Amino acid sequence: MTDLFAFGSAASSNAAEADYGLGGDMKKTQYVLQLLGFPGQADTLKCLIMAVEMGMETDSGVLDIIDGQDESSEYLEISPFGLVPALKEAEYYVAGESGIMSYIEARGLGKRLAPKNAALLAEQNYWSDIACSEVGPHVNLLVQERILAQMDDSVYMVKSDEINAARKALAAPLDALNDQLAKNTFIIGNYSFADIHWTAYLHLLNEAGEGDLITERANVKAWFDRVSTHKSFSGQNIVAYDLLPKLADIKNKQLNSIVIDDF
Protein backbone atom coordinates (compact mmCIF):
# COMPACT_ATOMS: atom_id res chain seq x y z
CA MET A 1 0.00 0.00 0.00
CA THR A 2 1.27 3.48 -0.87
CA ASP A 3 2.57 5.52 2.07
CA LEU A 4 1.00 8.95 1.56
CA PHE A 5 3.37 10.41 4.14
CA ALA A 6 6.50 9.32 2.26
CA PHE A 7 7.69 12.89 1.75
CA GLY A 8 9.86 15.46 3.48
CA SER A 9 12.71 15.20 5.94
CA ALA A 10 10.72 13.33 8.59
CA ALA A 11 9.95 10.52 6.14
CA SER A 12 13.64 10.01 5.41
CA SER A 13 14.43 9.30 9.06
CA ASN A 14 15.23 5.68 9.78
CA ALA A 15 15.85 5.75 13.49
CA ALA A 16 13.06 7.19 15.61
CA GLU A 17 15.28 7.38 18.68
CA ALA A 18 17.93 9.39 16.79
CA ASP A 19 15.41 11.73 15.23
CA TYR A 20 12.84 12.22 17.97
CA GLY A 21 15.11 12.38 20.97
CA LEU A 22 13.65 9.38 22.79
CA GLY A 23 16.91 9.15 24.70
CA GLY A 24 16.20 12.53 26.27
CA ASP A 25 17.78 14.99 23.86
CA MET A 26 15.57 17.70 22.38
CA LYS A 27 16.46 17.87 18.72
CA LYS A 28 15.28 20.11 15.93
CA THR A 29 13.80 17.20 13.97
CA GLN A 30 11.50 16.55 16.91
CA TYR A 31 9.49 19.52 15.73
CA VAL A 32 9.12 18.56 12.06
CA LEU A 33 5.49 17.85 11.25
CA GLN A 34 4.08 16.37 8.06
CA LEU A 35 0.93 17.98 6.69
CA LEU A 36 -0.99 16.29 3.89
CA GLY A 37 -3.55 18.58 2.28
CA PHE A 38 -4.61 20.53 -0.79
CA PRO A 39 -3.65 24.12 -1.71
CA GLY A 40 -7.18 25.09 -2.74
CA GLN A 41 -8.74 23.94 0.51
CA ALA A 42 -9.24 26.40 3.38
CA ASP A 43 -8.77 23.83 6.15
CA THR A 44 -5.30 23.00 4.84
CA LEU A 45 -4.41 26.68 4.82
CA LYS A 46 -5.61 27.12 8.41
CA CYS A 47 -3.24 24.36 9.54
CA LEU A 48 -0.32 25.89 7.65
CA ILE A 49 -0.98 29.26 9.25
CA MET A 50 -1.22 27.71 12.71
CA ALA A 51 2.07 25.87 12.22
CA VAL A 52 3.83 29.13 11.34
CA GLU A 53 2.24 30.99 14.24
CA MET A 54 3.38 28.32 16.68
CA GLY A 55 6.90 28.02 15.22
CA MET A 56 6.53 24.43 14.03
CA GLU A 57 8.61 23.20 11.10
CA THR A 58 6.33 21.43 8.67
CA ASP A 59 6.88 19.39 5.53
CA SER A 60 3.88 19.73 3.24
CA GLY A 61 2.59 17.10 0.84
CA VAL A 62 -0.32 17.37 -1.59
CA LEU A 63 -3.39 15.17 -1.35
CA ASP A 64 -5.03 15.49 -4.76
CA ILE A 65 -8.70 15.87 -3.91
CA ILE A 66 -9.51 16.75 -7.52
CA ASP A 67 -8.46 13.24 -8.51
CA GLY A 68 -10.29 11.77 -5.53
CA GLN A 69 -7.19 10.83 -3.55
CA ASP A 70 -9.04 11.71 -0.35
CA GLU A 71 -11.39 8.80 -1.10
CA SER A 72 -8.61 6.28 -1.73
CA SER A 73 -8.15 3.27 0.52
CA GLU A 74 -4.69 4.56 1.46
CA TYR A 75 -6.09 7.85 2.73
CA LEU A 76 -9.07 6.27 4.45
CA GLU A 77 -6.59 4.20 6.47
CA ILE A 78 -5.34 7.53 7.84
CA SER A 79 -8.65 9.38 7.95
CA PRO A 80 -11.57 6.91 8.01
CA PHE A 81 -14.17 9.60 7.34
CA GLY A 82 -12.10 11.32 4.65
CA LEU A 83 -11.41 14.45 6.67
CA VAL A 84 -8.78 16.66 5.02
CA PRO A 85 -6.06 17.60 5.83
CA ALA A 86 -4.12 15.01 7.81
CA LEU A 87 -1.09 15.49 10.04
CA LYS A 88 1.64 13.11 11.14
CA GLU A 89 4.35 13.50 13.75
CA ALA A 90 6.43 10.39 14.42
CA GLU A 91 3.78 7.67 14.88
CA TYR A 92 0.95 10.06 15.74
CA TYR A 93 -1.77 10.86 13.19
CA VAL A 94 -4.69 13.28 13.31
CA ALA A 95 -7.08 14.42 10.58
CA GLY A 96 -9.38 17.42 10.15
CA GLU A 97 -8.59 21.08 10.74
CA SER A 98 -10.02 21.25 14.27
CA GLY A 99 -7.92 18.41 15.64
CA ILE A 100 -4.81 19.48 13.75
CA MET A 101 -5.03 23.13 14.78
CA SER A 102 -5.55 22.15 18.42
CA TYR A 103 -2.62 19.72 18.30
CA ILE A 104 -0.25 22.24 16.73
CA GLU A 105 -1.32 25.01 19.10
CA ALA A 106 -0.71 22.79 22.13
CA ARG A 107 2.48 21.33 20.66
CA GLY A 108 3.98 24.62 19.53
CA LEU A 109 6.70 26.87 20.82
CA GLY A 110 6.06 29.69 23.25
CA LYS A 111 2.76 30.81 24.76
CA ARG A 112 -0.66 29.47 23.87
CA LEU A 113 -2.65 31.28 21.18
CA ALA A 114 -6.10 30.80 22.72
CA PRO A 115 -7.02 33.56 25.21
CA LYS A 116 -7.20 32.64 28.90
CA ASN A 117 -10.04 35.06 29.61
CA ALA A 118 -13.36 33.20 29.38
CA ALA A 119 -15.22 36.02 27.62
CA LEU A 120 -12.48 36.47 25.04
CA LEU A 121 -12.28 32.71 24.50
CA ALA A 122 -16.01 32.64 23.84
CA GLU A 123 -15.70 35.60 21.46
CA GLN A 124 -12.85 33.89 19.61
CA ASN A 125 -14.94 30.76 19.17
CA TYR A 126 -17.99 32.76 18.10
CA TRP A 127 -16.10 34.47 15.28
CA SER A 128 -14.45 31.19 14.31
CA ASP A 129 -17.90 29.60 14.07
CA ILE A 130 -19.16 32.48 11.91
CA ALA A 131 -16.21 31.99 9.56
CA CYS A 132 -16.77 28.24 9.26
CA SER A 133 -20.56 28.24 9.02
CA GLU A 134 -21.43 31.51 7.27
CA VAL A 135 -18.36 32.18 5.14
CA GLY A 136 -16.72 28.82 4.45
CA PRO A 137 -19.46 27.18 2.35
CA HIS A 138 -19.75 30.19 0.04
CA VAL A 139 -16.00 30.63 -0.35
CA ASN A 140 -15.70 26.92 -1.08
CA LEU A 141 -18.31 27.25 -3.81
CA LEU A 142 -16.53 30.22 -5.36
CA VAL A 143 -13.19 28.40 -5.30
CA GLN A 144 -14.83 25.35 -6.84
CA GLU A 145 -16.47 27.37 -9.62
CA ARG A 146 -13.63 29.79 -10.31
CA ILE A 147 -10.64 27.48 -9.93
CA LEU A 148 -11.07 23.79 -9.15
CA ALA A 149 -13.80 22.87 -11.62
CA GLN A 150 -11.75 24.28 -14.49
CA MET A 151 -8.70 22.33 -13.32
CA ASP A 152 -10.75 19.15 -13.65
CA ASP A 153 -12.47 20.17 -16.91
CA SER A 154 -10.81 22.78 -19.13
CA VAL A 155 -14.07 23.59 -20.93
CA TYR A 156 -16.14 23.89 -17.74
CA MET A 157 -18.66 26.73 -17.85
CA VAL A 158 -18.99 28.52 -14.53
CA LYS A 159 -22.43 28.73 -12.97
CA SER A 160 -22.98 32.48 -12.80
CA ASP A 161 -26.18 32.19 -10.78
CA GLU A 162 -24.42 30.20 -8.06
CA ILE A 163 -21.49 32.62 -8.03
CA ASN A 164 -23.80 35.60 -7.63
CA ALA A 165 -25.75 33.85 -4.89
CA ALA A 166 -22.54 33.06 -2.99
CA ARG A 167 -21.34 36.66 -3.27
CA LYS A 168 -24.69 37.90 -1.98
CA ALA A 169 -24.63 35.45 0.93
CA LEU A 170 -21.17 36.66 1.97
CA ALA A 171 -22.33 40.26 2.39
CA ALA A 172 -23.85 39.86 5.86
CA PRO A 173 -20.93 38.06 7.57
CA LEU A 174 -18.38 40.35 5.91
CA ASP A 175 -20.35 43.41 7.00
CA ALA A 176 -20.45 42.02 10.55
CA LEU A 177 -16.68 41.48 10.46
CA ASN A 178 -16.20 45.00 9.14
CA ASP A 179 -18.15 46.38 12.12
CA GLN A 180 -16.22 44.20 14.56
CA LEU A 181 -12.88 45.43 13.19
CA ALA A 182 -13.86 49.08 13.57
CA LYS A 183 -12.70 48.83 17.19
CA ASN A 184 -10.08 46.06 17.03
CA THR A 185 -6.68 45.55 15.45
CA PHE A 186 -7.45 41.85 15.17
CA ILE A 187 -10.86 40.23 15.36
CA ILE A 188 -11.18 39.98 19.15
CA GLY A 189 -8.43 42.49 19.93
CA ASN A 190 -5.36 40.26 20.05
CA TYR A 191 -4.47 37.76 17.34
CA SER A 192 -6.35 34.48 17.83
CA PHE A 193 -7.80 31.36 16.22
CA ALA A 194 -10.52 33.56 14.72
CA ASP A 195 -7.98 35.46 12.62
CA ILE A 196 -6.60 32.20 11.26
CA HIS A 197 -10.01 30.95 10.15
CA TRP A 198 -10.91 34.23 8.45
CA THR A 199 -7.46 34.61 6.85
CA ALA A 200 -7.74 31.23 5.13
CA TYR A 201 -11.19 31.95 3.71
CA LEU A 202 -10.48 35.50 2.60
CA HIS A 203 -7.17 34.51 1.02
CA LEU A 204 -8.97 31.95 -1.14
CA LEU A 205 -11.72 34.46 -1.86
CA ASN A 206 -9.06 36.82 -3.16
CA GLU A 207 -7.30 34.14 -5.21
CA ALA A 208 -10.66 33.20 -6.75
CA GLY A 209 -10.94 36.72 -8.16
CA GLU A 210 -13.49 37.97 -5.64
CA GLY A 211 -11.16 40.32 -3.78
CA ASP A 212 -13.52 43.26 -4.23
CA LEU A 213 -15.61 41.78 -1.41
CA ILE A 214 -12.60 42.51 0.82
CA THR A 215 -11.43 45.85 -0.55
CA GLU A 216 -14.87 47.47 -0.53
CA ARG A 217 -14.98 47.10 3.27
CA ALA A 218 -12.36 49.43 4.72
CA ASN A 219 -11.91 47.74 8.09
CA VAL A 220 -11.75 44.26 6.59
CA LYS A 221 -9.19 45.45 4.05
CA ALA A 222 -7.04 47.06 6.75
CA TRP A 223 -7.21 43.87 8.83
CA PHE A 224 -6.37 41.75 5.77
CA ASP A 225 -3.32 43.93 5.16
CA ARG A 226 -2.26 43.42 8.78
CA VAL A 227 -2.59 39.64 8.78
CA SER A 228 -0.76 39.55 5.45
CA THR A 229 2.34 40.89 7.22
CA HIS A 230 1.80 39.33 10.66
CA LYS A 231 4.95 37.61 11.93
CA SER A 232 4.86 34.34 13.83
CA PHE A 233 2.95 34.54 17.12
CA SER A 234 5.79 32.58 18.74
CA GLY A 235 8.34 35.20 17.74
CA GLN A 236 10.00 33.67 14.68
CA ASN A 237 10.89 35.95 11.78
CA ILE A 238 8.45 34.35 9.35
CA VAL A 239 5.10 35.48 7.95
CA ALA A 240 2.45 32.80 7.47
CA TYR A 241 0.70 34.64 4.67
CA ASP A 242 3.85 34.55 2.53
CA LEU A 243 3.61 30.74 2.45
CA LEU A 244 -0.04 30.50 1.46
CA PRO A 245 -0.60 29.16 -2.06
CA LYS A 246 -1.32 31.71 -4.76
CA LEU A 247 -3.57 30.98 -7.72
CA ALA A 248 -0.69 29.48 -9.74
CA ASP A 249 0.23 27.22 -6.81
CA ILE A 250 -3.33 25.97 -6.55
CA LYS A 251 -3.47 25.22 -10.26
CA ASN A 252 -0.09 23.47 -10.08
CA LYS A 253 -1.13 21.60 -6.93
CA GLN A 254 1.77 22.89 -4.86
CA LEU A 255 2.05 23.51 -1.12
CA ASN A 256 4.87 25.29 0.65
CA SER A 257 6.69 23.70 3.55
CA ILE A 258 7.64 25.65 6.66
CA VAL A 259 11.28 26.07 7.63
CA ILE A 260 12.04 27.73 10.96
CA ASP A 261 15.56 29.15 11.20
CA ASP A 262 15.29 30.94 14.55
CA PHE A 263 13.97 28.67 17.30
Question: Which ranges hold each PLM region?
Answer:
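Terminal-tail/helix-coil boundary detector
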Residues: 236-263
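GST-like fold's C-terminal all-alpha helical module
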Residues: 2-5, 133-226
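GST-like domain detector, emphasizing the conserved glutathione-binding G-site
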Residues: 2-164, 254, 262
